[in-house]
A protein has these predicted regions:
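Gly/Ala-rich beta-loop-alpha elbow adjacent to hydrolase catalytic centers
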Residues: 94-102
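Conserved HGGG/HGGXW glycine-rich cap/lid loop of the alpha/beta-hydrolase fold
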Residues: 6-62
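Catalytic histidine-centered segment of alpha/beta-hydrolase-like enzymes
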Residues: 236-249
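Flexible "cap/lid" loop of the alpha/beta hydrolase fold
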Residues: 103-145
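Active-site loop/oxyanion-hole signature of alpha/beta-hydrolase fold enzymes
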Residues: 4, 49-91, 250
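Short beta-strand immediately N-terminal to the catalytic nucleophile in serine-hydrolase-like folds
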Residues: 92-94, 120
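Conserved alpha/beta-hydrolase catalytic His-Asp/Glu region
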Residues: 128-130, 144-197
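Conserved serine/cysteine hydrolase catalytic core
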Residues: 184-223, 232
Length: 278
């Protein structure tokens, strides 16, 4: 049986904002277990109603998800599923690949109306010149490193580092050329995202030890967004919500309690060209 592309999971109940969590490439909803376990001890998190989406690029998802040319459409489907079942999301939290796709969706013409967004370990480059050949040739190794890091965190005390590399390479094979092509395409067009269209309050979170999506990219994104705040997490890499769950829970709790900020000036994307949508 072919797995369903998008599956919605309720994580908590509450009478506060409805929050949708979106995992990254080859991950699962379990990446949110640690911060969600801390929710009862924080006012805003305790009141919030948390949902998580199992997305097609999860480790057990359908192998053909990459055949769809616009992967951000899968996030729109997750938002529509939540809206139909429980009501529209107030806040959406995206990690890694999903953070990049969420940004793409919200900068587009059919952006959902949200009260806030949280972008964790996002991929973003402000100018097309920021990409070079070394960027492209180095990304495959970064993909494997990301998979290794995720496997290590998921395994915990049961970790067998000698197996992690082989497992990570197998995951990369499972995602396949079309899946990774969707990543490349989304990443390469980040300089042209219409970030001025994004008016919701935004929290950008980056681990200072992230070897995969560097903090400099998160900082560039926060500078581009007029309503964004950048928060870095010490002693964390690409998965700050799992590596430093207490710190991440504090940041999310603080964000959910903040009033909507007044918009200020923000950076602008390059002038549009015929390559705006690659």
């Amino acid at each position: 049986m072919t797995p369903r592309p998008v599956i919605l999971r309720r994580l908590t109940t509450g009478n506060g904002p409805r929050v949708l969590l979106l995992h990254g490439m080859a991950d699962s909803v379990s990446i949110w277990d640690k911060p969600i376990a801390l929710a009862p001890h924080r006012k805003a998190l305790h009141q919030a109603e948390f949902f998580a989406a199992e997305l097609p690029w999860r480790g057990t998802g359908p192998a053909d998800w990459g055949y769809r040319a616009e992967p951000s459409a899968w996030l729109a489907e997750a938002l529509d599923t939540l809206a139909a079942a429980e009501g529209p999301a107030d806040v959406v939290v995206g990690h890694s690949f999903s953070a990049m796709l969420l940004l793409d969706l919200l900068c587009g013409p059919a952006a959902p109306d949200l009260r806030g967004i949280v972008l964790i370990s996002p991929y973003f480059r402000a100018r097309p010149e920021d990409f070079d050949w070394a960027t492209m040739t180095g990304l495959p190794e970064k993909f494997v490193l990301a998979m290794e890091e995720g496997i290590r965190l998921a395994a915990g005390a049961r970790a067998k580092p000698v197996l992690h590399r082989a497992m990570a390479e197998r995951l990369c094979e499972f995602i396949g050329p079309y899946g990774w092509s969707r990543f490349f395409e989304s990443y390469l067009r980040t300089p042209w995202l219409r970030t001025e269209n994004l008016t919701a309050p935004a929290l950008v979170v980056s681990g200072t030890g992230d070897r995969i999506a560097a903090t400099a990219e998160a900082a560039a994104l926060a500078e581009r967004l007029s309503t964004a705040t950048l928060r870095t997490v010490e002693d964390a890499g690409h998965f700050p919500m799992a590596e430093q769950p207490e710190r991440f829970a504090d940041l999310l709790d603080e964000f959910l309690q903040r009033p909507a900020p007044v918009r200020g000036p923000a950076g602008k994307p390059p002038h549009p060209t015929s390559l705006e949508r690659i």
